[in-house]
Design a protein with these regions (language model features):
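Active-site loop segments of alpha/beta catalytic cores
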Residues: 1-36, 76, 99-251
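Secondary-structure transition motif
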Residues: 21, 48, 59, 72-73
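Cofactor-binding catalytic cores of oxidoreductases
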Residues: 23-25, 54-55, 68
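Glycine-rich loop at the start of a catalytic domain that most often binds anionic cofactors/ligands
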Residues: 32-41, 65-68
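Catalytic domains of carbohydrate-active enzymes, especially glycoside hydrolases
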Residues: 40-57, 173-177
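Short, polar loop motifs at secondary-structure junctions
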Residues: 56-59, 110-111
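A contiguous, low-structure linker/loop signature
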Residues: 60-106, 118-123
Length: 251
């Protein structure tokens, strides 16, 4: 049983020869400590799946800060993950200015194309992206997003529809190129519980997540849901697998 067969056996609810290992991200320090040049070499040696992230271009680079195609400004990370520093949606009028980066740009899938060519049928090919929540957070800022959910729910819903429609196209494209599954990486919680109320999740996010998951299944792929924190009742969706960083507790 090779790595691909091992992972797919688990997703088909059968017993493999051993537990497969997959991971969405590894610190550069760990990668280098194991003598690998990059994350993909590390995954090829030690994991049963190759996880590749969607790629967005850097449009402005001012040393410690850079801006991507969404108009979000980030601060360069000391470790692995950059953090948004400036959010382009500051007020209700800014919602109308949102232009979602196109889904059909080949640049989005550069790493995926290479992974499929090298590992298709040998290891599970996992394409990592978001559905909507963290894009909304980074476009608006967390506090501002919560305020807009209360004050301008219609504008928030229109923004979420733009984002999730775009991400559905991206997921379909990735699967058509040879990805076996989609790893969706929106964080919905911190250690003590969800970031948003069950009512807000059910009203705004659950219907769109359902549409997103259904689109992946209809395209023949599997869905892995990643989230930091204790997601509580948010975890009831139709996921094939949950990659949860903190213990998940049902109420």
């Amino acid at each position: 049983m090779n790595s691909y067969e091992r992972v797919m056996t688990v997703f088909q609810h059968q017993e493999p020869d051993r537990i497969p290992l997959i991971e969405m991200s590894v610190s550069d320090q760990i990668v280098k400590a194991f003598g690998c040049q990059d994350l993909y070499e590390f995954q090829s040696k030690y994991y049963d799946g190759i996880t590749v992230r969607i790629a967005y271009r850097t449009l402005q680079d001012d040393g410690p800060f850079y801006q991507d195609e969404w108009g979000i400004t980030y601060k360069y990370p000391q470790d692995t993950t950059g953090h948004s520093y400036h959010h382009p949606i500051q007020c209700p009028d800014d919602f109308k200015k949102l232009v979602v980066p196109t889904a059909d740009d080949p640049y989005r899938y550069n790493y995926l194309e290479k992974a499929v060519k090298a590992y298709k049928g040998k290891k599970a090919i996992i394409f990592s992206t978001r559905a909507m929540f963290l894009w909304a957070v980074e476009l608006c800022g967390m506090e501002n997003l919560m305020v807009q959910i209360a004050w301008e729910p219609q504008l928030v819903e229109e923004m979420l529809d733009k984002i999730v429609d775009n991400q559905i196209l991206i997921a379909r494209k990735a699967l058509s190129m040879g990805a076996d599954m989609i790893l969706e990486t929106d964080d919905y919680a911190f250690n003590t519980g969800p970031l948003i109320s069950p009512a807000a999740f059910d009203a705004l996010f659950a219907p769109r997540l359902t549409r997103y998951v259904d689109a992946i299944h209809e395209a023949g792929g599997y869905m892995i849901k990643h989230s930091d924190g204790n997601i509580g009742s948010h975890g009831y969706m139709k996921y094939a697998m949950i990659n949860n960083i903190r213990p998940r507790q049902r109420p």
